[in-house]
Every structure is written in structure tokens, then in C-alpha cells.
Amino acid sequence: METKKLYECTVIIDGGLQDEVIAAAMEMVQKVIADKGGSISSVLEVGRRKTAYPINKKTIGYYAHIEFTAGTSVIAEIEKVLRYEEALMRYLIIHLTSALLEMRKRVEKYSVVIGSPEDNAGNEVEASEGESK
């Protein structure tokens, strides 16, 4: 029997799509993970955000993180299905090691929550005319 490990899948869905299509894409990602033998432990939907750079000429994406446990052999199968999903702009699956989990706990312990992601959406700092870029 294969040992299951903890993974995190981060997806960026096209933010220009309707909410129903985004919800369907999220359901599809979760269904693929479950169908391939994964067990989802948490889902964090961050929401629509401006991307750091244009992806396929699009600058708004819907971000979500899914933590799940699965065998190492099914990760390639999950990626194969996600690769051809048109609504996904990007995806990344990483193995969450004990060092990453410990670092995450320390960051959460010492971080200050300023507001929800929706409250901070679009808050960008621009240099004034007198400042150099």
C-alpha cells in the first residue's frame, strides 16, 4: 500500500468568468482529487485578485488553495486532468513537508490580520510624481 502524503494545490481560475462557472471549476478540481484517491482536508477560496503579471492576456484571477492527502503516484494523474481544464489559468501542486507546516504555523502566530482579502482588493500603492520608480 502506498503511503499518503499531504499536498497543497493552488489554482488560479479565470477571474473574468461568471461565478457559476468558477464554482463549477472549483467543484471539478475537488472531484478530480477525490476520484484519484485523494482526501481533501481544507479548501481556502481567496477570491478574485489582480495577478502579478498578465496570464494569457488576463490580469484578474480567482485564487484558491486546496489541502489534501494522496499517494505520490496519483499527483501526475491529477496534473494531467488539470492541464486540460480551460477555466484554469495556472495550477501548482506542492508537497507540504513538516518544515513548511512549521513555518506556516510560525507565520500565522506572528502575523496580524488587517482585514479580509475582499477588503484589500485593489489596494495598490503607486509612486507619486516626485518619487523615483
UniProtKB/Swiss-Prot annotation:
One of its GO terms (biological process) is translation. Keywords: Ribonucleoprotein, Ribosomal protein, RNA-binding, rRNA-binding. InterPro entries: Ribosomal_bS6 (IPR000529), Ribosomal_bS6_sf (IPR035980), Ribosomal_S6_plastid/chlpt (IPR020814), Transl_elong_EF1B/ribsomal_bS6 (IPR014717). The keyword Oxidoreductase does not apply. It holds the Pfam family Ribosomal_S6. It comes from the Bacteria. One of its GO terms (cellular component) is ribonucleoprotein complex. GO terms for molecular function: small ribosomal subunit rRNA binding; structural constituent of ribosome. Belongs to the bacterial ribosomal protein bS6 family. Binds together with bS18 to 16S ribosomal RNA. PANTHER family: MITOCHONDRIAL 28S RIBOSOMAL PROTEIN S6 (PTHR21011), SMALL RIBOSOMAL SUBUNIT PROTEIN BS6M (PTHR21011:SF1). This is Small ribosomal subunit protein bS6. It comes from Chlorobium phaeobacteroides (strain DSM 266 / SMG 266 / 2430).
